Amino acid sequence: MTQFRTVLLTSGLILALCAGAAQAQSTGKPSLTLQMPALPDPVRVVLKPATTALLVLDYVDPICSSQPKCKGAMLPAVTPFMAGVRKAGVIVAYGTRERTMSNWLPEVAPAPGDIKIVNTTQDRFYNTDLDKELKAKGITTIIMVGWKVSGSVAYTSVGATVRDYTVVIPVDTTAASTDYETVIGFYQILNQGNSNLTNEPLKPKSPTLSRTDMITFQ
């Protein structure tokens, strides 16, 4: 992930300079600088349609439409991917707040029979029937896409893995407002309770970072 590594190095330098300046002003002592490790590259995965679901988060107006990264990069990546997902017969579920449930962007709008979850927190599993509905359909793996990686995607991935789901996150279908926040989001996801620091493909009950062109169905 060249972009991520570049962002990490740049962000680390900025953080070090800012921290050093602040500490120098307050104490006059040398500062301690830290650098985040580089994220692993996305990996190829092969999924079984019968036990896989696509979970779509906040591709809605105005949340996605007001964010250049969501509208300009994420949406063009997820639109053809979703078409392939539906063609493979994968279950599709949607989660957003009540006020935006009717505002899904037309490129990725729900189809009849799709699961719809109204959430009150960023974790779509918290106080909803999502787990019940997915398990009733025999789902064990969730592909998670949407806005934003450091918010709903990160928290919902934790909610999924603690409920024994294996999670796949295509890195081109989620992001945050800044490159720095995007990297932090992916880092959080891989370092959650059921961590996958090396990004082992489809590590059970853990998150895996992949990409839309690296996900196939058998």
Explain the meaning of each model-derived region.
Residues 25-53, 80, 99-218:
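Active-site-adjacent betaalpha module
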Residues 56-57, 91-97:
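Short beta-strand segments at enzyme active-site cores
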Residues 20-24:
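Sec/Tat signal peptide C-region and signal peptidase I cleavage site
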Residues 53-66:
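Acidic/histidine-rich, surface-exposed loop or edge segments in extracytoplasmic proteins
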Residues 50, 67-85, 90-94:
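A short alpha/beta connector and helix-capping loop motif
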Residues 10-18:
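Bacterial N-terminal signal peptides
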